[in-house]
């Protein structure tokens, strides 16, 4: 495994060529917020004039959340989109805001208050959405590969809302994205992958390996274990109300219990995944080329899966 990125090398190309597994690197969040922020975006994006004070506002809340900037469709009608988890179901809401009022709107959303004084955008049922990281100021791979995929996807998937968003973590896995309402993150995506994800055909093992994780499970072993559900139950697995939990850790062996309840039949399923920590790979970054990485990612291998009948 390459331990240092040379100047001129791209982190996503190296990670792809070395077949580094992105499993376990997804965000852990129950609330996702996308704020329309006009380009260009600085690094970090919170230094943008529109987002001044927002990072401090978010730090006052301890529940898992992620706020990203989103390229506006209309700079004169900026929106805030929120995906909130209520009783295991994901709700999408959207409001139009004036820049001086953003903090006030965010505060109400974060506190779970009734939103008054802001125009709410009517929502379509079961909207499919893709947030692709395209922040070139954070990493050249997301800026180039992410933007290219987002623009092509926008012309091919009319029924899916494609958003170009700021840093989602894992730029070494560009193009990287998150799908809604599934809350599943993906790595090294291409158009063929998106056709499968937004289509009806089964998700094969090759595409499952591109899954960074489901954002309802903790980062690391739990996310690697949870994605095995895609192999066992197929794409219907994303409809189950799921929970995962590490039940034992001994030496480098980890046991994870994953349970799911079908939303309609209420039938319960579950499995135990036995994982092995096999190695640690460097977190490569284009903007740190030439220097030794200071972050490392644990690679896991699934040893066996025991499905409960």
Where are these regions (language model features)?
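Histidine/cysteine-enriched polar flanking segments
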Residues: 1-309
């Amino acid at each position: 495994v390459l331990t240092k990125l040379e100047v001129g090398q791209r982190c996503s190309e190296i990670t792809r060529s070395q077949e580094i597994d992105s499993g376990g690197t997804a965000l852990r969040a129950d609330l996702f917020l996308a704020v329309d922020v006009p380009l260009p975006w600085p690094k970090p994006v919170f230094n943008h004039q529109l987002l001044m004070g927002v990072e401090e506002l978010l730090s006052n809340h301890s529940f898992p959340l992620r706020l990203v900037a989103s390229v506006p469709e209309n700079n004169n009608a900026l929106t805030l989109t929120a995906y909130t988890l209520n009783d295991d179901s994901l709700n999408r809401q959207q409001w139009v805001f004036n820049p001086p009022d953003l903090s006030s709107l965010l505060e109400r959303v974060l506190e779970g208050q009734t939103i008054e004084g802001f125009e709410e955008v009517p929502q379509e049922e079961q909207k499919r959405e893709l947030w692709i990281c395209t922040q070139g100021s954070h990493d050249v791979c997301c800026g180039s590969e992410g933007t290219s995929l987002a623009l092509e996807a926008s012309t091919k998937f009319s029924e899916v809302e494609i958003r170009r968003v700021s840093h989602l973590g894992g730029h070494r896995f560009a193009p990287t994205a998150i799908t809604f309402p599934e809350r599943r993150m993906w790595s090294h995506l291409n158009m063929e992958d998106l056709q499968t994800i937004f289509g009806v055909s089964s998700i094969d093992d090759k595409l499952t390996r591109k899954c960074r994780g489901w954002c309802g499970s903790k980062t690391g072993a739990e996310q690697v274990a949870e994605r095995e559900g895609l192999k066992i139950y197929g794409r219907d697995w994303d409809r189950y109300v799921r929970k995962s939990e590490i039940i034992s850790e001994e030496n480098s062996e980890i046991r994870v219990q994953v349970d799911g309840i079908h939303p309609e039949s209420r039938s319960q399923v579950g499995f135990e995944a036995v994982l092995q920590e096999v190695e640690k790979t460097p977190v490569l970054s284009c903007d740190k080329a030439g220097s030794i990485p200071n972050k490392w990612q644990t690679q896991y291998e699934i040893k066996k899966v025991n499905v409960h009948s």
